[in-house]
C-alpha cells in the first residue's frame, strides 16, 4: 500500500515552484560551462531514452523507412582502432546519432555514417545519453559529463554516476540521473541540487508532475525538491523506468504483471497479467499501453484507463520496449525484427525482418536505429 505524503513533502510541493532554490551543491567542474538552457522546443529527433522524460516512447506521426530497407552498421566494435561497443540506444539530433559505449562516446553522421568525433570518458557508459540545452549529457559508472554536441569537448563533469539502469533525463534546466536513487544536477553548471534515495528504488525513473522511480517491489514518487511524496509497496520486481501519462504511472514487473498506479497518491488503479521476463518500460499513447513479449511470444496492448486487454501480436522473445509512432506502434522481436502495428487493432502494417534486435527502436529523421544483441553495435534502417 502507498504511504501518505509527509507534512514536509506537502510544504515542498506547494512552495518549491522551481528547482532554483535547491542548493545542496557539491562540486561540478563548471569553470567555463558555455551552456544556456532555453525553451525545449522540438530540436531533437530523439533526445533521450523513452523519447521524453515521461518515458512514454510516444512520437507524433513521422516517416519510416520502406519495408525492404537494409540495416547498416553505424558504430563499429573492434573492427577499427578505438572501436565502440555500445550497451545502449543513441540520442539523435541535427542529423547526428550520439552513442555511449564501454570504450567511448561517439557522434555519427546519419547520412554518411562517418564518425564526427569520439571521446573517451575514462569509464564506460552503459545507459543511453540525453540531449538538451544544446548539450549532450552522458552518465558513466562514476560520473555525469556535459559534452559539446559539435566536437565532444567537456563542458563540465561531476561525480554522480549511474551504477545500474536508468538513463539521464533533461527537463528545463535540470539533468536527472540515476545514481542509486535520483540526483538532480544543474544542467548549465553540473552543480548538485539534491539527491534522494527512496527505499528499495534505483532501477529507473520518469519525470512528469513528480519524479517516479521504480525499484525492487516498490514504486516511489518524489517532489521536484527531492522530498518523498509516496511509496507503493508490493508492486513486484520492476527492472526499468515507469512510464507516466494522464495522471497514471505504468510499471511492468519481471514476474508478469502490468501495474497502473495513481500518480497523485500511488494507489493501484488496475493490475493485469503479461508475459514473464519483461525488463523494459511500457509504451503509452493514444489510449493504449503496449508491453513487449518478455520471455513469452506475444506483445500485448491494454486500454490505458481500464486495463482491459485489446490485442496480442506474436513477435517471439523480446525484452526491449516498443515505440509508438502516431496511430501505430513499432514492436520489436529479438529474432523477428520490427513489426509496425495498428495501435487500435493490432493489425500489422509493415515488417522489417531483421535479426538480433537488442534494443528499443529509435525512430528519428525517417530512420530506425537499434542496437544488435550479438555485436553490441548500433545499426540503422533507412
PLM segments and residue spans:
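N-terminal secretory signal peptides and thylakoid transit peptides that target proteins
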Residues: 1-18
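Signal peptide processing junction and immediate N-terminal pro/mature segment
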Residues: 25-29
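Aromatic (tryptophan-biased) beta-strands that constitute blades/sheets of beta-rich domains
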Residues: 31-86, 111-123, 151-162, 191-198, ...
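Cysteine-rich, disulfide-stabilized extracellular repeat modules
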Residues: 42, 113-115, 132, 152-154, ...
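Repeat-blade elements of multi-bladed beta-propeller folds
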Residues: 46-51, 83-103, 123-144, 162-183, ...
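Hydrophobic/aromatic beta-strand positions that recur at structurally equivalent sites within the blades
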Residues: 49, 108, 147-148, 185-186, ...
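Membrane-interface anchoring determinants
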Residues: 78-81, 100, 108, 147
